[in-house]
């Protein structure tokens, strides 16, 4: 029963991590495409809040429940699919802190534009591009992790099955 409870929490955390993360990402993209500093400042404030209070804790819950599930099943951390997913998770996590910082910076830049009555400058576009591409790579990693969790195979093992 403990295993099933942990697995349930692990899956819920994955849903929150992926769902809120993707939702935040898409909302800030949509807001930025308006080029309206007021819209961007408001959406970025909410995105920073949701990512800080929901998405980030979901990531910690993922790693804790994943570790407990591995311990409970007696599976070594060096099992190929486990180690691969853990490495990808850590890489995605390493992108996460800079993404949070960049989101906060985008919010501050948009708010400053609102307060001064100016339009967003090239500085905003540069920070936005970094944030955007870090998000692309982060979500690609998350898609791969979900595939690994479902199949219990590494990507190269799956490719080997297709060849």
Task: Say what each PLM segment does.
Residues 1-163:
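Polytopic transmembrane helical bundles with strong interfacial aromatic enrichment
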């Amino acid at each position: 029963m403990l295993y099933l409870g942990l697995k349930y929490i692990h899956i819920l955390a994955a849903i929150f991590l992926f769902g809120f993360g993707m939702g935040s990402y898409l909302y800030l993209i949509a807001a930025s495409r308006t080029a309206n500093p007021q819209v961007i400042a408001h959406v970025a404030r909410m995105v920073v809040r949701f990512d800080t209070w929901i998405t980030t804790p979901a990531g910690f819950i993922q790693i804790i429940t994943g570790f407990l599930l591995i311990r409970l099943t007696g599976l070594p951390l060096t099992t190929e699919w486990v180690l691969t997913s853990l490495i990808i998770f850590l890489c995605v996590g390493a992108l996460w802190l800079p993404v949070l910082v960049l989101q906060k910076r985008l919010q501050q830049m948009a708010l400053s534009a609102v307060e001064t009555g100016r339009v967003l400058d090239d500085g905003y576009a540069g920070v936005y591009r970094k944030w955007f591409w870090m998000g692309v790579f982060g979500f690609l990693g998350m898609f791969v992790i979900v595939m690994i969790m479902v199949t219990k195979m590494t990507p190269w093992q799956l490719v080997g099955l297709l060849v």
